[in-house]
């Protein structure tokens, strides 16, 4: 039996994700993990909205632990919100998304839904100690553990897709995996794609939304080869200062793209602020279309959507 803080977190997340509706709860699903650990996954809910199915699944990494305040350490739970197109059964690219500090994937529901509507399976884990509902309050010291969380979710998602009776059976293309993240989730995704210590070679493209290099990182970023990069940044961001994004963008290898959101701040462009959110949706989809789906038109679509007078400017180094 998981400790009460973890159980409460699942209940809160389901309510935020499904609007309080937890229909069609399925039986537990098993998902084999990497050789150094075991994984368990449990489907918590299923809803359908805007032709996108949303499920909440819990992956458990028994090779690592987490300790909530006033509780003993337990295997690391990764409650994960999964979205995928309702009408598509062929293998699709996978995008794993990392949320920022003191929020949850629910805050980014419009962006993540747009990706799923565009033909992607989208998985967004809730980081155990950085999320808004973490017992005792969010703890940013856990940031260094999050790249491994996202890698573990990739492993769990591929395992589910390989199971004949899974709701994801045959829906994920293992060779077309992208990652993204915003704020601390952007730092997590950046490390997972480009930091030699955390790098996951399964990643084929990365969209870093107002992110930065991990604090006090001594690792070498952008070894050869490096996956294509899209970096986005609000020019008026006072939380993740623009130079953090500009610094890693300059160091990155081609192909790389920088989308500057003129006058935009830190979180709202990715959650509620318009028309910036719509610009983010179009540019990120075009980027993933180009580098995960192999669509040449994606590059022109990025330029068209990413250059909006007074709102956005795209720098491209293909």
Regions found by a protein language model. Give the residues of each.
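Gly/Ala-rich beta-loop-alpha elbow adjacent to hydrolase catalytic centers
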Residues: 100, 181-185, 189
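Short substrate-entry loop that stabilizes the transition state in hydrolases
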Residues: 88-92, 97-135, 238-241
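Acidic catalytic loop of the alpha/beta-hydrolase fold
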Residues: 236-240, 266-267
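Short beta-strand/loop motif that positions the catalytic acidic residue
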Residues: 225, 231-233, 237
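Short conserved active-site loop signatures built around small residues
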Residues: 27-33, 40-90, 96, 121
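Alpha/beta-hydrolase active-site loop
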Residues: 107, 139-174, 191
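Short alpha-helix in the alpha/beta-hydrolase fold that links the catalytic acid
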Residues: 240-250, 273
């Amino acid at each position: 039996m998981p400790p009460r803080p973890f159980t409460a977190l699942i209940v809160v997340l389901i309510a935020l994700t499904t609007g309080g509706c937890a229909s069609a709860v399925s039986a537990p699903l098993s998902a084999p993990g990497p050789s150094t650990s075991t994984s368990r996954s449990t489907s918590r809910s299923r809803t359908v909205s805007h032709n996108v199915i949303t499920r909440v699944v819990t992956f458990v990494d028994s090779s690592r632990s987490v300790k909530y305040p006033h509780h003993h350490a337990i295997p690391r739970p990764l409650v994960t919100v999964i979205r995928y197109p309702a009408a598509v059964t062929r293998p699709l690219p996978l995008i794993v998304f990392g949320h920022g500090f003191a929020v949850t994937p629910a805050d980014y529901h419009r962006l993540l839904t747009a990706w799923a509507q565009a033909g992607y399976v989208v998985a967004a884990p809730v980081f155990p100690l950085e999320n808004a509902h973490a017992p005792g309050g969010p703890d940013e010291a856990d940031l260094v553990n999050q790249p491994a969380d996202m890698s573990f979710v990739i492993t769990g998602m591929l395992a589910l897709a390989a199971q004949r009776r899974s709701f994801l059976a045959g829906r994920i293309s293992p060779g077309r995996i992208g990652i993204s993240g915003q704020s601390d989730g952007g730092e997590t995704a950046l490390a997972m794609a480009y930091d030699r210590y955390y790098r996951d070679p399964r990643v084929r493209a990365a969209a870093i939304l107002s992110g930065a290099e991990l604090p006090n990182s001594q690792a070498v970023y952008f070894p050869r080869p490096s996956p294509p990069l899209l970096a986005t940044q609000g020019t008026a961001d006072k939380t993740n200062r623009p130079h953090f994004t500009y610094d890693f963008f300059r160091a990155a290898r081609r192909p790389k793209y920088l989308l500057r959101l003129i006058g935009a701040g830190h979180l709202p462009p990715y959650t509620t602020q318009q028309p910036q959110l719509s610009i983010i949706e179009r540019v990120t989809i075009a980027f993933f279309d180009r580098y995960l789906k192999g669509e040449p038109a994606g590059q022109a679509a990025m330029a068209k959507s990413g250059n909006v007078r007074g709102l956005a400017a795209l720098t491209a180094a293909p």
